[in-house]
A protein has these predicted regions:
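Secondary-structure end/capping motifs
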Residues: 227-305
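Short, glycine-/small- and polar/acidic-enriched structural segments
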Residues: 31-159, 164-167, 183-187, 209-211
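C-terminal motif of bacterial Sec signal peptides marking the signal peptidase cleavage site
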Residues: 22-23
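Solvent-exposed, polar/charged alpha-helical surfaces in well-ordered, non-transmembrane soluble domains
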Residues: 76, 80, 94, 130, ...
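Pocket-lining segment of extracytoplasmic ligand-binding domains
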Residues: 91, 171-260
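N-terminal secretory signal peptides and thylakoid transit peptides that target proteins
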Residues: 1-19
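Conserved C-terminal helix/tail region of periplasmic/extracytoplasmic solute-binding proteins
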Residues: 297-325
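Helix N-cap/coil-helix junction residues
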Residues: 101, 158, 264, 305-306
């Protein structure tokens, strides 16, 4: 639902160019919150739509939103010092887990896994994932889509060499699936529902039991180190937590707002909510989330998706627990 209202997250606004990083480095030092601008990464129809609706937009600091097409791009922007805070799944930080990374995970969002699916065309003869051996399967690189596909392959004792894996953006994947260029598509969010509605796609598998459903709130380490910016991040996270709670009790209102922001029909959002595996909540860093992301990293390393094993534990920052409890 909310995490993938974004998932027209395929729409990347040009507001944050990584070539302008030097000019985007946050200022530090004395001052007041009213003089501070918190740089927040979001998706189309995301936090910039939700917080005002939930009555959480009256911040004592300014907020500059930049829309991104995916959590992998938000991860890159944080590491480029272009963003102070943003959200993504537990997958992108694995690819950024290196000693000099600037990304820190400050909270855990528990979300839906039923909107992460393997789709096949309506006339496909496939009845189980094993039937897709040798077939053209679309996925989104460095996202839950790639990890989900790897898990499905491992269940059948297959590897990426046993399929024709096609890395595509969600936008390109939807178009390719619609014109019959894919035999299956491993995808998430609004696009998965759109493919079912527009093209009659059939769900072959869901991610229930295969993905954790953990998403992450992450921040720039430089911003955390600055007292004023840290204060703004803590306040903003609390507002996001309350806004998620509002969306749970106002599903019809949220569906209308998300639809207006993204152009996807209201019915798509209501259908997503009806089919989801659980509510969306934001809470503090938790041991199970730390363990889960390390397991993702270990799985990717063993499969050769990343070049070497990585320790993801240094990415976690538990100092915002009070703001999220």
């Amino acid at each position: 639902m909310l995490l993938h209202a974004p998932s027209r997250r395929r729409l990347l606004a040009g507001g944050v160019g990584l070539g302008l990083v030097a000019a985007c480095t946050p200022r530090t030092g004395a001052g007041s919150l009213r003089d501070l601008t918190l740089r927040v990464a979001t998706f189309k129809g995301g936090l910039q739509t939700l917080l005002p609706a939930a009555g959480q937009a009256n911040t004592p600091y300014k907020v500059a939103y930049s829309e991104f097409a995916g959590g992998n791009l938000i991860t890159e922007a944080i590491n480029a010092r272009a963003i102070d805070v943003g959200t993504m799944s537990e997958i992108p930080p694995v690819f950024a887990a290196r000693p000099n990374t600037l990304l820190r995970i400050v909270g855990v969002i528990r979300g839906d896994v039923n909107d992460q699916v393997t789709l096949v065309p309506r006339d496909s003869t496939a009845t189980r994932f094993a039937d897709l051996k040798g077939k053209r399967i679309g996925y989104v690189r460095a996202t839950t889509s790639q990890y989900f596909l790897l898990r499905l392959l491992q269940e059948q004792k297959l590897t990426f060499a046993d399929i024709q894996a096609v890395a595509l953006s969600p936008q390109d994947g939807l178009a390719a699936f619609g014109r019959g260029a894919l035999d299956a598509w491993v995808i998430y969010g609004i696009d998965s529902t759109l493919a079912r509605v527009q093209f009659g796609a059939r769900v072959l598998t869901t991610a229930l039991g295969r993905l954790s459903g953990n998403y992450l709130a992450a921040a720039l380490s430089d911003a955390i180190a600055d007292p004023l910016r840290r204060q703004a991040i803590a306040d903003f996270l609390g507002r996001v937590k309350r806004a998620y709670a509002w969306s749970e009790t106002h599903p019809d209102d949220w569906a209308k707002l998300a639809s207006a922001a993204t152009g996807a029909p209201i019915s798509i959002y209501l259908r997503q909510r009806k089919e989801r595996s659980g509510p969306t909540t934001l809470g503090p860093v938790a041991p199970d989330a730390i363990t889960s992301m390390q397991a993702v990293a270990d799985t990717f390393a063993k499969a050769g998706v990343i070049p070497a094993p990585v320790d993801t534990r240094p990415l976690w920052d538990e100092s915002f627990s009070a703001a999220l409890s």
